[in-house]
């Protein structure tokens, strides 16, 4: 009787634990939420933390001498640690002076031994001080002639961080081939970067943007082509794809008023303009148009719950490490539920 009692009690405990786990389900695979230091990002983290297992705090940059600048969002880091969510510090070459990513700034730090060492040493200090799990290097608009220099830089930094048990993730623009004529993506040698980085975050968003003609922010076939190229050059278990939590609104007549539209903003815009969204089969994305008070026609491209779920599932299809979301702050739970369904 005692044996059967023990079995019965064990079974009951197992059922309770299963139900608890089901209610507090965590993200499957790697799900990274990019955050800033603002209140909206923090609120999203506290609301939707069960849908992610890592955050990347996009609050750091650097100067031409390699000096790291920026502040650690302590509230977010404290909360993430409490919830056992891994944290990454994003270091970008964004330059406030020019309101853009600065290829020359990146080149300076990559080519100058003193600046490179200072940059790397300070990354280690930063990670140790704030208990970051890893460093996410996000150098964008790297100069085309710096392709080899950037690969060598990633090798140098990754090896230095590895010695201190700090992980390295590198963000790269999405591409389906190495094209010397593509100044934006050519500088990133996937194979060499993937050899030394622990993870490579492929930015599978911004296929189109307000800097160009209207179109899908992340069409299905474009993502597929990018992931196919990525896993040929990089081990699949190192690759992370990107999911946009935003869309773009193009003013067809006056491009200067074109703007980004956050996830939560889109539904209210549709309601306000009495727009009729349509699914674009070719891109696998949503689109609609409207006319504003100035009689200007606008074209909007975005993702909804269904398309987010479909595109998130590509992470499973290509057996990659996971997904990343850019960015926390103005998304809803329905967005996160779509990612969870897609990555299951």
UniProtKB/Swiss-Prot annotation:
Active site feature: 140 (proton donor)
Record's signal peptide: 1-27
Keyword Electron transport: no
Enzyme class: hydrolase
GO MF assignments: chitin binding; hydrolase activity, acting on glycosyl bonds
Domain of life (superkingdom): Bacteria
Gene Ontology terms: biological process: carbohydrate metabolic process
EC number: 3.2.-.-
GH18 domain span: 29-344
Segments traversing the membrane: none
Protein name: Uncharacterized glycosylase YvbX
Organism encoding this protein: Bacillus subtilis (strain 168)
Gene name in the database record: yvbX
